[in-house]
Amino acid sequence: MAAVAVAVREDSGSGMKAELPPGPGAVGREMTKEEKLQLRKEKKQQKKKRKEEKGAEPETGSAVSAAQCQVGPTRELPESGIQLGTPREKVPAGRSKAELRAERRAKQEAERALKQARKGEQGGPPPKASPSTAGETPSGVKRLPEYPQVDDLLLRRLVKKPERQQVPTRKDYGSKVSLFSHLPQYSRQNSLTQFMSIPSSVIHPAMVRLGLQYSQGLVSGSNARCIALLRALQQVIQDYTTPPNEELSRDLVNKLKPYMSFLTQCRPLSASMHNAIKFLNKEITSVGSSKREEEAKSELRAAIDRYVQEKIVLAAQAISRFAYQKISNGDVILVYGCSSLVSRILQEAWTEGRRFRVVVVDSRPWLEGRHTLRSLVHAGVPASYLLIPAASYVLPEVSKVLLGAHALLANGSVMSRVGTAQLALVARAHNVPVLVCCETYKFCERVQTDAFVSNELDDPDDLQCKRGEHVALANWQNHASLRLLNLVYDVTPPELVDLVITELGMIPCSSVPVVLRVKSSDQ
């Protein structure tokens, strides 16, 4: 039986196998010597050719990089990773990643320059700066824009919302500091109700009266503003009548929305007022459709009374008892501005027999500390009065700082009357503990690290100081380079606050998220 002979030879350099297929007459015989020599010669030529190609590829790659950097306006660049003159041949493995990145970057810059040159030839607009260099200084440091970027669409929506609700809009003052140009600023001289017809208006008269009191500063303070709002809402609920084919739980909520927009036009709502409105809306939506109207209205008014009693009155009593433990005989306590809660704590501690002295620090333009000074002197508490620039001179003899709060944010920051952060910082420099007294209904889920993003701007005309017939800063609007900033609140970081006294107990600022989580689970 004849066997088929196949010659197989392995090349140690290439690792490939060569196989000579049998010819027409090669079946049953071995390869001749001449055939083996011819096969060995062909293999050597192929191996030499591969070595020459490997040595020529790096030179070709460097030529590609040089050609890409000097590309003209009419030359098309080859794709990255493809060698010139070869169909879809990959970049050799000898190239480093840095060289490949530099090559791609040079290609992109060349293509960008080519596009800009074509636009210039067509008479188009001048080319814009590339995203990589826009807003950068020659040193490579990015700079923030000079003016804050405000979304025009959002502003139009905010303006149209009161118009849809038939709420009069208040004219903005216009002359503002550029850093706070995104915040509304109103003048008390521009009346919101000047062209408002009360009989034909959708705004309840109680809300109109409350809004005017807010705008003129007749009702100030977080607790006083919140209580006044809830009392006005009780009057609104008392006068409310459910329309035909409507449910109280739905119609009343919609009826309150223009009222809140009107109050916001008068003065931005505080965090405590937002929480009270959220509570009332929840109570309204939980009213069953089977209840009679008078019964439902009576329950809502009772819920408002219960909210005021539990969240404000009883909470103040509990905070006063906790704060009493932190006041010792012979203390020198520094307070700032006018906080109804802090004033109550000091008066009750004096009535209980603790003997101490109070330093009242005040600041323009409100000078609210005078109200605190009158109440303390009337109660027999020894007190002294000074302005905030002189606070650093009395802090060496102060034993503790007792402050109120407008709101306590979710990140532990304290939002309070402007100047509070300054006092807390100076107190930390003198190693004086800072205690903040705040009810938990002022806790909010908003997070804020500075006073620039969200704040309130008061009337800048209040900064004018009148001494006799002379008025400082008179006609300041006529000076184009002059702007007045009357900031209402500032934000104190939690690192400057040693303790927060609430009706739940004495907690650190880091426990604010825990309190918010417990409150949300209870609701």
UniProtKB/Swiss-Prot annotation:
GO biological process: cytoplasmic translational initiation; myelination; oligodendrocyte development; ovarian follicle development; regulation of translation; response to glucose; response to heat; response to peptide hormone
Modified residues (N-acetylalanine): 2
Record-level Gene Ontology MF annotations: guanyl-nucleotide exchange factor activity; translation initiation factor activity; translation initiation factor binding
Biased composition (Basic residues): 41-51
Modified residues (Phosphoserine): 12, 130
Compositionally skewed regions (Basic and acidic residues) per UniProt: 30-40, 87-121
Residue numbers of Phosphothreonine PTMs: 86
A GO cellular component entry from the record: eukaryotic translation initiation factor 2B complex
Role according to the record: Acts as a component of the translation initiation factor 2B (eIF2B) complex, which catalyzes the exchange of GDP for GTP on eukaryotic initiation factor 2 (eIF2) gamma subunit. Its guanine nucleotide exchange factor activity is repressed when bound to eIF2 complex phosphorylated on the alpha subunit, thereby limiting the amount of methionyl-initiator methionine tRNA available to the ribosome and consequently global translation is repressed.
Family affiliation: Belongs to the eIF-2B alpha/beta/delta subunits family.
Quaternary structure and interacting proteins, as annotated: Component of the translation initiation factor 2B (eIF2B) complex which is a heterodecamer of two sets of five different subunits: alpha, beta, gamma, delta and epsilon. Subunits alpha, beta and delta comprise a regulatory subcomplex and subunits epsilon and gamma comprise a catalytic subcomplex. Within the complex, the hexameric regulatory complex resides at the center, with the two heterodimeric catalytic subcomplexes bound on opposite sides.
Protein name: Translation initiation factor eIF2B subunit delta
